[in-house]
């Protein structure tokens, strides 16, 4: 083999190894928690939307008889509304903090701030680790990365009103969570 071919092969191997090491640096607990938080926040927002509100969708084309061919879908499951929710979902990541399960010592990010209709139902704070704004900004970055990467998949999952959206999104579509996470989770 000529020396330049060996050099090119060496450069390609080095580049491949560099890509592999940077891919594996994603914090699994962080990205899994961000994915779960996205599903939880969108589910909550959908549940707070009036189910009677409908929106017209379709091309608004005229049929040969002069009538319109549009259809109504629930606002909460419309692509327009879900896109609006996705634009805002990562702002709520400041309501999450690192939580260490006292039994298993597993770490994940969980919501610590009660929602408006929770009636002041605060969680037990002794297992939360509040590391300042750095931890919530890391979760927000992970959230934004997931939303940017999987926006179309997230919208189609929530628009179809499928069961176990969190499991489907976080375990099957994005592969950020192991399926064992869902044996312990209430999502």
Curated annotation (Swiss-Prot):
<keyword id="KW-0732">Signal</keyword>
<feature type="signal peptide">
    <location>
        <begin position="1"/>
        <end position="24"/>
    </location>
</feature>
<keyword id="KW-1015">Disulfide bond</keyword>
<dbReference type="GO" id="GO:0070121">
    <property type="term" value="P:Kupffer's vesicle development"/>
</dbReference>
<feature type="short sequence motif" description="Prevents secretion from ER">
    <location>
        <begin position="184"/>
        <end position="187"/>
    </location>
</feature>
<dbReference type="InterPro" id="IPR021852">
    <property type="entry name" value="DUF3456"/>
</dbReference>
<keyword id="KW-0256">Endoplasmic reticulum</keyword>
<dbReference type="GO" id="GO:0030917">
    <property type="term" value="P:midbrain-hindbrain boundary development"/>
</dbReference>
<feature type="disulfide bond">
    <location>
        <begin position="90"/>
        <end position="143"/>
    </location>
</feature>
<feature type="disulfide bond">
    <location>
        <begin position="35"/>
        <end position="170"/>
    </location>
</feature>
<keyword id="KW-0217">Developmental protein</keyword>
<dbReference type="GO" id="GO:0040036">
    <property type="term" value="P:regulation of fibroblast growth factor receptor signaling pathway"/>
</dbReference>
<dbReference type="InterPro" id="IPR042415">
    <property type="entry name" value="CNPY"/>
</dbReference>
<protein>
    <recommendedName>
        <fullName>Protein canopy-1</fullName>
    </recommendedName>
</protein>
<dbReference type="GO" id="GO:0005783">
    <property type="term" value="C:endoplasmic reticulum"/>
</dbReference>
<comment type="similarity">
    <text>Belongs to the canopy family.</text>
</comment>
<comment type="subunit">
    <text>Homodimer. Interacts with fgfr1.</text>
</comment>
<dbReference type="Pfam" id="PF11938">
    <property type="entry name" value="DUF3456"/>
</dbReference>
<dbReference type="GO" id="GO:0007368">
    <property type="term" value="P:determination of left/right symmetry"/>
</dbReference>
<comment type="function">
    <text>Involved in the maintenance of the midbrain-hindbrain boundary (MHB) organizer. Contributes to a positive-feedback loop of FGF signaling in the MHB, enabling the MHB to exert its role as an organizer for the tectal and cerebellar development.</text>
</comment>
<feature type="domain" description="Saposin B-type">
    <location>
        <begin position="28"/>
        <end position="181"/>
    </location>
</feature>
<dbReference type="GO" id="GO:0008543">
    <property type="term" value="P:fibroblast growth factor receptor signaling pathway"/>
</dbReference>
<feature type="disulfide bond">
    <location>
        <begin position="32"/>
        <end position="177"/>
    </location>
</feature>
């Amino acid at each position: 083999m000529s020396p330049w071919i060996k050099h090119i092969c060496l450069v390609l191997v080095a580049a491949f190894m560099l890509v592999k090491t940077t891919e594996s640096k994603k914090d699994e607990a962080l990205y899994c928690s961000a994915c779960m938080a996205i599903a939880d926040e969108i589910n909550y927002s959908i549940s707070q939307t009036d189910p009677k509100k409908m929106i017209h969708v379709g091309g608004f084309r005229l049929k040969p008889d002069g009538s319109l061919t549009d259809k109504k879908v629930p606002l909460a499951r419309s692509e327009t509304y879900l896109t609006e929710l996705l634009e805002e979902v990562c702002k709520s990541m400041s309501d999450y903090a690192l939580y260490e399960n006292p039994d298993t010592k597993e770490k994940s990010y969980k919501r610590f701030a009660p929602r408006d209709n929770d009636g002041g139902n605060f969680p037990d704070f002794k297992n939360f680790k509040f590391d300042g704004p750095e931890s919530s900004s890391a979760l927000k970055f992970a959230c934004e990365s997931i939303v940017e990467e999987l926006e179309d998949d997230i919208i189609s999952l929530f628009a179809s009103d499928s069961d176990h959206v969190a499991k489907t999104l976080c375990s099957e579509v994005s592969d950020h969570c192991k399926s064992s996470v869902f044996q312990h989770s209430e999502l």
